[in-house]
Amino acid sequence: MDGVANTPEKMERYIKTIYNKSNEMDRLINELTFYSKMDTKKIPYTFNKISVTEFFDDCAEDLQTELGAKNVEFYYSNYVEPEVTVIADAEQIKRVVNNIVSNSLKYTDSDKPKKINLRVKDVGDFIQVEIEDNGKGIAAKDLPNIFDRFYRTDASRNSSKGGSGIGLSIVKKIMEDHGGKVWATSKEHTGTVMYFVLRKYQEVPVNE
């Protein structure tokens, strides 16, 4: 990089760019590999009983570090009692969260501070997860299609945004395989909220 990164500041910036591009490539390869397993119905799920609070606390800690490095404001609220559990594949639910956050970051406005808000709520027999951004929002005509494979909204057609175009379709597939669902609400120029729900685990009483 002689003559290009000729100061420590430039060198640091180039290294950071290379690191970020490498991570993006790893994520793209990972998504395409997972996508191929979706079509052959060979997704290797490992379902376990997991603590909702412990799981999302860990997610929030990771996101705080990752988003902080990108100068994104991150907020986390958990309204679920500590004893609540779900039957889920922790790795794949983490993929759901990461894919939604990654999608949100691609389409945030560059002229205002980026914000991501993660909320976990108790809604009867389910836990509801909400991931809110303050991005460009999604037009009403596009909203029903955003979880379709390779669908891109008008706001996302710039190739510089990167990505595979399958991140949200993967989210939908994982949630369906967990017996849950995912949807979104949005307001243009204000932001988008992505929701997904998982059924709580409940012990079935055994008659003696």
Tell what function each PLM region has.
Residues 20-25:
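Short alpha-helical segment of the dimerization/phosphotransfer core of two-component systems
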Residues 179-180:
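Conserved glycine-rich
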Residues 104-105:
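Short helix-loop "hinge" at the ATP-lid/N-box region of the Bergerat-fold HATPase_c
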Residues 40-45, 83-88:
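Conserved micro-motifs of the catalytic ATP-binding
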Residues 46-64, 120:
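A conserved beta-strand-to-alpha-helix junction within the catalytic ATP-binding
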Residues 138-150:
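Short conserved segment of the HATPase_c
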Residues 115-125:
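Short beta-strand/loop element within the Bergerat-fold HATPase_c
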